[in-house]
Amino acid sequence: NLNIIAYNNLSVTHTGNVVETVVRSFQIPTTEINTNSVIEILAQFGSSGGAFTKTLRVYFNTSNTLVGATLIGTQQSSATQFYGGFRRQIVNKNSINTNRIIPSAAVQVTDITNLTVNMANLNWNFSGTTWLIATIQLGNAAASATLENIQVKLSKP
């Protein structure tokens, strides 16, 4: 049973400063998430100018702010031109608030390609309010990067 529970395909580009900047945020409807659900976050992120570092970060929080937010995953590139997919799976382990994930510090494009680290405890409580917050940070103000879309899928037994 697979459902898209949150989705936004409005492209948003960040340029002009090196400050981590929120480019997308929305509340995830958590009423369908159960004790053995798999929550999958997918996004497309890219850039077409400058060999500077561009970083996409995805967070969860109980409110629409970065203050106190939990980092879910990071994608980073210094290529002059790139376009890639971001993917993280969160696996609930017989509980709504005991879950596992590839460590958030892993900078690989997706958790499929990341074979060199162990799973980590996330322990996010999906019984409460959950905001997904996506940010872009540039290594140089002359760079630019675009979040093309982001979605949350839910798979449950």
Language model features: what each stretch is:
Residues 2-157:
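Surface-exposed molecular-recognition determinants
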